[in-house]
Amino acid sequence: MTILRHPLRFLFKPRFLYFQSPSGQSSRPFSTSQILRTALDMPPPPVDTTQRLAKLRELMAQNKVDVYTFISSFTGSAGCAIVSMSKAALSTDGRYFSQAAKQLDSNWTLLKRGVEGVPTWEEWTAEQAENGKVVGVDPSLITAADARKLSQTLKTTGGSLIGIDQNLIDAVWGDERPARPSNQITVQPVERAGKSFEEKVEDLRKELAAKKRSAMVISTLDEIAWLFNLRGSDIPYNPVFFSYAIVTPSVAELYVDENKLSPEARKHLEGKVVLKPYESIFQASKALAESKASASSGSGGKFLLSNKASWSVSLALGGEQNVVEVRSPITDAKAIKNEVELEGFRKCHIRDGAALIEYFAWLENALIKEGAKLDEVDGANKLFEIRKKYDHFVGNSFDTISSTGANGATIHYKPEKSTCAVIDPKAMYLCDSGGQYLDGTTDTTRTLHFGEPTEFQKKAYALVLKGHISIDNAIFPKGTTGYAIDSFARQHLWKEGLDYLHGTGHGVGSFLNVHEGPMGIGSRAQYAEVPLSASNVLSNEPGYYEDGNFGIRLENLVICKEVKTPHKFGDKPFLGFEYITLVPFCQKLLDASLLTEAERKWVNDYHAKVWEKTSPFFEKDELTTNWLKRETQPI
């Protein structure tokens, strides 16, 4: 199995995007368009993958492999493809059932994850590996834990798992595979990071000492960027760079292409971090393992490794006998923002809110007053141009989801100029977008209607808004997980027999990845593992989607914080949320009669704050001021 986003997309001839494995190390740029068709109105036919699969199967035969498995993750989510000598399957979750059903050609079977009676991808793979067949994976693209799990599953049907150092998808790709990017690495100054990298490294060393570990090998890109207060742009929308790192009690090593370091970055690291060639990480890991093996009995400890690190890194360090796999302490530390980072989040959300307000005012005027014919890409491009005007803007934090009508029901829809729909002023319009700013990262979704919504659309909007408000108002004891509060967002939909097939909230980085862990809010088991903590930044984004008709999602970012309560049961602190996104909800979709008095007060208080914080940007912009005044009026 290959945990990587590009192989599946290569088989399907994707658009130009970069994707990364969980550790981020095997990301490659590629060209994405045909099979990943995105329009629901007149979708082009699926790309015929017959020849690509045939080439892959030739290589499988040469490597004496009966089944080849690899993971494909869309932005912020996951899918898995498995190819045997006669069959091919794609497993994905509810966010992509509709999209995948439209995009797969006849060579592929869709495995709907979580649906009763449908096998998991591991079970399906085991079925193909019956009677001694061999399953091959690229060990650099699967975690050690996932490799062990898959191996155990295969044994139940008599199959076996082997690692293949050559990535067979790359071999099929051949010369068409673009080169790895080599963009400049810059410093995130302590004035914005809130803590020096020397302090962060020292904190990690204390963690190693407490756990009696001799070193930590770090392979997750946003962890490395955060740890060393550096930022890059090797992966679009994510300010990270291709690298590895090793931290011991006495030395910090960064494995990176030195030519990418800006003069400022070199000075930043000089005398404190040893620079090593990116490609030498596996040799260095093996040397660590050999050094441990030759050391006298009892000296040193096992190596600390993230449970998201690749199987190949674990093997280079000597495998389970030398490695302890844990949730990375860097991930935990990164998720708890310091006061400088939190203030940056608050400030960048005021500017980003102003940009979205300006965009929505422009869009309504263009569609309704001017009668302009604008497609979904035109809208996304205009929003980007508006954001660029605001201070400290670096770029988008993900592909803008600009979707009209039925396209809004595809949860992670991405419009393409050749196939996207014209924005229909008589239909719902869902816009999910975000920006990367030097002082923070944003992610906001609003659903609007420029005409006359139906009564059901207004009711569905109210149910989603009620869930959004329920999360925003939640108060819970320290130690509570996002799994425990997820139902707060869904309860109003459930009473009507409705639901949505995605999580309610994800962590967000500080001028880093717009999706980060380890915490989140959702109904999957993973959300029950890590409690929410004060100073986490998360999204609050319930939704509702009606295939072939419309989608609704309402998303703010929130800061988890300690709150005052009349009592303190068990002497435990209680936590709640502070919203930082400042964009009005759609007046045409707001039906005050469907909200309680407390909910109406929440909306009115929210809109008053939106007006207070963003209206000063539009003192010389009558169009936007009038739109904002109308959209923030009390209900």
Swiss-Prot record:
Binds 2 manganese ions per subunit. One of its GO terms (molecular function) is metal ion binding. One of its GO terms (biological process) is proteolysis. Its EC number is 3.4.11.9. PROSITE patterns: PROLINE_PEPTIDASE. Keywords: Aminopeptidase, Hydrolase, Manganese, Metal-binding, Metalloprotease, Protease. It comes from the Eukaryota. CDD domains: APP. It catalyses: Release of any N-terminal amino acid, including proline, that is linked to proline, even from a dipeptide or tripeptide. The keyword DNA damage does not apply. InterPro entries: Creatin/AminoP/Spt16_N, Creatinase/aminopeptidase-like, Creatinase_N, Pept_M24, Pept_M24B, Peptidase_M24_C, Peptidase_M24B_aminopep-P_CS, X-Pro_aminopeptidase_P. Mn(2+) 2 binds at D432, D443, E555. Mn(2+) 1 binds at D443, E541, E555. This is Probable Xaa-Pro aminopeptidase P. It comes from Arthroderma gypseum (strain ATCC MYA-4604 / CBS 118893) (Microsporum gypseum). The gene is AMPP.
